[in-house]
A protein has these predicted regions:
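Beta-strand-rich modules
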Residues: 96-125
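Extracellular low-complexity, O-glycosylation-prone stalks/linkers
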Residues: 61-83
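Short, linear, compositionally biased motifs with a strong N-terminal bias
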Residues: 10-11, 86
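Bacterial N-terminal signal peptides that target proteins for export
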Residues: 1-8
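Residue-level signal for short segments within beta-strands and strand-turn junctions
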Residues: 57, 73-77, 110-114
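C-terminal motif of bacterial Sec signal peptides marking the signal peptidase cleavage site
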Residues: 15-19
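Short beta-strand segments within Ig-like beta-sandwich modules, predominantly Fibronectin type-III
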Residues: 84-90
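Pro/Thr/Ser/Gly-rich low-complexity, intrinsically disordered linker/stalk tracts
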Residues: 21-65, 116-137
Protein backbone atom coordinates (compact mmCIF):
# COMPACT_ATOMS: atom_id res chain seq x y z
CA UNK A 1 0.00 0.00 0.00
CA UNK A 2 2.81 2.41 0.88
CA UNK A 3 4.42 1.72 -2.50
CA UNK A 4 1.20 2.59 -4.35
CA UNK A 5 0.89 5.89 -2.46
CA UNK A 6 4.52 6.75 -3.26
CA UNK A 7 4.07 5.96 -6.97
CA UNK A 8 0.81 7.93 -7.07
CA UNK A 9 2.48 10.92 -5.39
CA UNK A 10 5.42 10.85 -7.81
CA UNK A 11 3.04 10.58 -10.76
CA UNK A 12 1.00 13.52 -9.47
CA UNK A 13 4.13 15.66 -9.03
CA UNK A 14 5.42 14.81 -12.53
CA UNK A 15 2.07 15.64 -14.11
CA UNK A 16 1.74 18.93 -12.27
CA UNK A 17 5.26 20.04 -13.23
CA UNK A 18 4.84 19.11 -16.89
CA UNK A 19 1.34 20.44 -17.46
CA UNK A 20 0.40 21.94 -20.80
CA UNK A 21 0.75 25.61 -21.56
CA UNK A 22 0.30 27.73 -24.62
CA UNK A 23 3.69 29.13 -25.61
CA UNK A 24 2.13 31.69 -27.95
CA UNK A 25 0.39 33.35 -25.01
CA UNK A 26 3.71 33.66 -23.20
CA UNK A 27 5.59 34.96 -26.26
CA UNK A 28 2.96 37.48 -27.36
CA UNK A 29 3.86 40.97 -26.25
CA UNK A 30 0.67 42.29 -27.80
CA UNK A 31 2.34 45.30 -29.41
CA UNK A 32 2.64 45.96 -33.11
CA UNK A 33 4.55 49.18 -32.57
CA UNK A 34 8.20 50.01 -32.66
CA UNK A 35 10.25 53.03 -31.77
CA UNK A 36 13.12 53.91 -34.14
CA UNK A 37 16.65 54.12 -32.75
CA UNK A 38 18.50 57.35 -32.09
CA UNK A 39 20.69 58.41 -35.01
CA UNK A 40 24.23 59.77 -35.30
CA UNK A 41 25.13 59.04 -31.68
CA UNK A 42 28.59 60.43 -30.91
CA UNK A 43 30.60 61.57 -27.95
CA UNK A 44 33.10 64.34 -27.40
CA UNK A 45 35.43 64.32 -24.42
CA UNK A 46 35.48 67.99 -23.50
CA UNK A 47 38.25 67.54 -20.95
CA UNK A 48 39.51 64.81 -18.63
CA UNK A 49 36.35 64.87 -16.53
CA UNK A 50 33.52 65.72 -18.95
CA UNK A 51 31.95 63.80 -21.82
CA UNK A 52 29.18 65.17 -24.02
CA UNK A 53 26.94 62.74 -25.88
CA UNK A 54 25.10 64.02 -28.95
CA UNK A 55 22.49 62.32 -31.13
CA UNK A 56 19.62 63.15 -33.42
CA UNK A 57 15.97 62.18 -33.16
CA UNK A 58 14.73 60.34 -36.29
CA UNK A 59 12.52 62.46 -38.51
CA UNK A 60 9.90 59.72 -38.78
CA UNK A 61 8.28 58.91 -35.44
CA UNK A 62 4.95 57.02 -35.60
CA UNK A 63 1.97 59.30 -34.92
CA UNK A 64 0.78 56.83 -32.26
CA UNK A 65 3.22 58.43 -29.80
CA UNK A 66 2.99 61.74 -27.96
CA UNK A 67 5.51 64.43 -28.69
CA UNK A 68 8.01 65.27 -27.36
CA UNK A 69 9.71 61.88 -27.34
CA UNK A 70 11.87 61.05 -24.31
CA UNK A 71 15.50 59.97 -24.48
CA UNK A 72 16.77 57.45 -21.94
CA UNK A 73 20.48 57.05 -21.23
CA UNK A 74 21.79 54.14 -19.19
CA UNK A 75 25.19 54.63 -17.58
CA UNK A 76 27.55 51.69 -17.11
CA UNK A 77 30.77 52.36 -15.19
CA UNK A 78 33.53 49.70 -15.25
CA UNK A 79 30.94 47.14 -16.47
CA UNK A 80 28.60 47.90 -13.54
CA UNK A 81 25.21 49.46 -14.23
CA UNK A 82 25.17 52.75 -12.29
CA UNK A 83 22.28 54.93 -13.34
CA UNK A 84 19.61 55.78 -15.88
CA UNK A 85 18.47 59.25 -16.78
CA UNK A 86 15.49 60.31 -18.85
CA UNK A 87 15.45 63.52 -20.87
CA UNK A 88 11.84 64.45 -21.62
CA UNK A 89 11.94 67.25 -24.21
CA UNK A 90 13.64 65.61 -27.19
CA UNK A 91 17.03 66.91 -26.12
CA UNK A 92 19.85 66.03 -28.51
CA UNK A 93 22.82 66.21 -26.13
CA UNK A 94 23.81 65.68 -22.52
CA UNK A 95 27.07 66.21 -20.61
CA UNK A 96 28.33 63.76 -17.99
CA UNK A 97 31.04 64.16 -15.38
CA UNK A 98 33.39 61.17 -15.44
CA UNK A 99 36.35 59.75 -13.57
CA UNK A 100 39.23 59.49 -16.10
CA UNK A 101 40.49 56.30 -14.43
CA UNK A 102 37.24 54.44 -15.23
CA UNK A 103 35.68 53.05 -18.40
CA UNK A 104 32.17 54.12 -19.31
CA UNK A 105 29.46 52.76 -21.57
CA UNK A 106 26.35 54.74 -22.38
CA UNK A 107 23.23 53.20 -23.92
CA UNK A 108 21.00 55.75 -25.65
CA UNK A 109 17.35 54.85 -26.33
CA UNK A 110 14.19 56.62 -27.41
CA UNK A 111 11.07 56.18 -25.28
CA UNK A 112 7.65 56.86 -26.78
CA UNK A 113 4.44 57.22 -24.78
CA UNK A 114 1.21 56.29 -26.53
CA UNK A 115 -1.40 58.92 -27.20
CA UNK A 116 -4.69 58.42 -25.33
CA UNK A 117 -6.37 57.12 -28.50
CA UNK A 118 -3.73 54.40 -28.97
CA UNK A 119 -3.36 53.33 -25.34
CA UNK A 120 -4.90 49.89 -24.80
CA UNK A 121 -6.24 48.94 -21.38
CA UNK A 122 -3.93 46.50 -19.63
CA UNK A 123 -1.00 47.16 -21.98
CA UNK A 124 2.18 49.12 -21.47
CA UNK A 125 1.94 52.86 -22.07
CA UNK A 126 5.48 53.20 -23.45
CA UNK A 127 7.68 51.64 -26.12
CA UNK A 128 11.48 51.79 -25.92
CA UNK A 129 13.78 51.58 -28.93
CA UNK A 130 16.83 49.41 -29.19
CA UNK A 131 19.82 51.05 -27.58
CA UNK A 132 22.80 52.60 -29.31
CA UNK A 133 25.95 51.82 -27.30
CA UNK A 134 28.76 54.33 -26.89
CA UNK A 135 32.02 53.24 -25.22
CA UNK A 136 34.20 55.89 -23.56
CA UNK A 137 37.58 54.69 -22.34
Amino acid sequence: MKKIVTIFTILLVVLSLSSCYDRDVLDDKGLNYFMPMTENVQYNQDNATAVTLTWSIPSVIPEDFRRPISVQIQIVENNIYRDRITLVNEETSHTFTIDPAKKYRYIVKLVGTFTEENQETGRTSTVTSEGVIVNVE
